[in-house]
Structure formats: C-alpha cells, structure tokens
C-alpha cells in the first residue's frame, strides 16, 4: 500500500443554505457535516490530511482542531483551485491522494477504502467514485472504454443522446496519484462560463496524456449525497438517523418507532434498553442495559446506569446510577450526580446536586446547589432556596433526613443526619442530627369568624 493523503474541500460559503452558519458546519445528527467526513477519512491510515478552508475558516479550524492541517482558499475560484491550495503541504509527496467534499456527511470509510484499493490495484493515475441511479438528470455521466476504464466525464448539459442514456454518474469524489495531481492542476484552464478551475478537468488532462483513469462504482448512492441546501440537509439527517437507529437495533436496542427516535452518532446504548417514540439522545451520552427511555425524553451528554427508567423528562450533562426512576416531567440539569435506586418524580428539577442512594424527591421540588445524603425523603414542594439575587449557596442534607411537604431550606444551611423538618417550615438555621425542626407560625382558630365577617359585609 502506498502512502495515503486526503484533501477535504470545505471552503464554500453555501449561499443556498441561506444561513449565517458556514455550510460544512451545519449539523447532521448533532455533528457538523465536515466532522463526519473527517472522522471517516481518518480511518484510512493517512500520512497527511489537509482541509481547504475559506469562508468561516477560523470556525472550521476550531471545530476540527489538530486532526487536520489546513490550507486557505482566500478566493473561491473552483474545485481545482481549492485542491491546489494544498500544494505547499502535499505537492512533493509520493503516494495516493483522496479528494472529497466536506459537505458529504454520509460517506463511509468502507466506501473510501474500496475506492483507494481499486485505484491502487488498477495502477491508475486517477480513480473516480461513481454510482448508478435510475434518474441521473443533472449529473455528469461516466463514459467507459472497452477496458472498463474511464474514457471521459460528460456533464449533463453537454451530453449527446447516447451519453444521456448512461446511468453511471460522477459523485465528485476522486483519488489521484499525488504527483500527477499537482502537476496537472497547473494545466487546468478557467476558460468556461463561470471563469473557474474545475477538478474534473484533471481527469481529462490525465486521460489525454495516456494515463489510466479508473472508476469504482459504489452500491450506496445515498453516501454520495452533497448537501447544498436545507432540503438536502434534511435528507442527510433522515438517512444518517436511520443508519444510527439500525445499528443500535442490530446491537440489541429496542426502538419502538425509529422514525420518531433521534440518536447522536457518539451515543452508546446497552442491550435490552427500550426507546419509546419522541426520544432524543444527544452528544456523548452513554446509556446502560435494560433501561426504558421515553416517550418524549431528551438526554444530552449524560451517563445513565442500568435498569433506569426516564419518562417524559430532560437530562443534561449529568450522571445517573442504576435502578433510577425519573419523571414524568422532571428536569435534571447540568453537573448533577444521581445515586442508585433514586426516585426523581413529576415536576422535580435538580441542578448541580449530588443526590444520594435510595433518596426520593417524588413531586414538585426544586433542588439546586445541594448535597443530599442517602435514604432521604423530600416531601412534595420541598425547595432549596439557593439564590439571594447575587450569589448561589449550598444546602447540605444528611443521611436519613425527612423533609416535610412545602418546606423551604434557605441556603447556606445544613440538615444533619436523621433530622426531621416539619411540613410548611422555612429553615434558615442548621438542624442538628435527629432533631425535629418546626419553623412556621402556630395555628390559630377564630371561632365564628366567618359569620362575623359575612354580617359585616352585609351592613
């Protein structure tokens, strides 16, 4: 196997997207298009990877980091001109160079590997990735000679009747002998309507010089989809979503309604977990085995333990233990750590809190900036009052504490192990271990008060 290099074309603005966000940074299943391409290309054993950037160069470089070198195409003068910007990095190298667009998020490493192998086995100077489609209108046609090699690529508008009948099309992905590529780029002309330098012209140059130009026809046309507008973006999203869902189902995850379930490419889900309709799993989420998620649940960048149930709730940037029950309509906000066998019930919000094993907040509570021990019961309407309008303060609740309904714990405050707080209390001072704290006005009954009040209103 020869040395391998790759050039990703990511300089276009994407005018048809009608967006402030640069085209290749538009996400597909939660990840920018160009990141999908880089992740797949990086599996090919490359010696060097160069991403050609232009519009939004800094943002693209920030997204990709140090996994790629970068070349700047300050003025967009066509695809051949874009590749030529990588000359300072690659022109003197010997080997094979893959050229692919950064707006093809569905391409897989397997397809690109097959393309490279075809190129190397054929001893070609260039190899074109092609596909067969029944309705090829608008695509360049691949004309092969008697040896099966590429004779020429004919654009749809330039094709004759015989060529229009060809259903093998150019996908816009190529590999080249690296030295031949950069030698040919200087020969490409911009004598065309757009005044641009086009990469397919390199194919014609090499062919006219007597070199072999081969083609590899992929069976997976959907992988070659180029995203140029929001319609194509939605198509890519659907295809990627279906691919991810299928992979998870093959690995033992039950997805009740795949058309209404969204899973990020980086999520990991254990076997025998069930996902109900309306479930959205984003980012680097890890979900254990035998869980039940949804319906209508969002989990982002979180770790969920085995045998946990989350219904109609939201979990962000948090860690949940095993056998946890969440929801319905609960919200676990970032930096929360929920222990094992915990109950977080309906309309409970937890933020930046450590919540101990076997503890419960079953209804209508806000627990923020708190440390909750084990075997704690927080009654309906329990609130940690953590904010004074300027600063956040911490509430500490020990093991075995029982907080009565409709209680306010005004932070900073500590309720020590085994203490009880009476319903309706507003706690502003620490509660000692095993004490009962009552902080509410004493009840007063005024006999016959209602009759007196009504008579007063009548007079």
UniProtKB/Swiss-Prot annotation:
Q: Which PROSITE patterns match?
A: HEXAPEP_TRANSFERASES
Provide the binding site for UDP-N-acetyl-alpha-D-glucosamine. 9-12, 23, 73, 78-79, 140, 155, 170, 228, 333, 351, 366, 377
State the residue spans of region: N-acetyltransferase: 252-459
Which pathway features in its UniProt record?
Answer: Nucleotide-sugar biosynthesis; UDP-N-acetyl-alpha-D-glucosamine biosynthesis; N-acetyl-alpha-D-glucosamine 1-phosphate from alpha-D-glucosamine 6-phosphate (route II): step 2/2; Nucleotide-sugar biosynthesis; UDP-N-acetyl-alpha-D-glucosamine biosynthesis; UDP-N-acetyl-alpha-D-glucosamine from N-acetyl-alpha-D-glucosamine 1-phosphate: step 1/1; Bacterial outer membrane biogenesis; LPS lipid A biosynthesis
Question: Could you tell me what reaction this enzyme catalyses?
Answer: alpha-D-glucosamine 1-phosphate + acetyl-CoA = N-acetyl-alpha-D-glucosamine 1-phosphate + CoA + H(+); N-acetyl-alpha-D-glucosamine 1-phosphate + UTP + H(+) = UDP-N-acetyl-alpha-D-glucosamine + diphosphate
Chain segments carrying region Pyrophosphorylase: 1-230
How is this protein named in the record? Bifunctional protein GlmU
Q: What organism, scientifically named, is this protein from?
A: Bacillus mycoides (strain KBAB4)
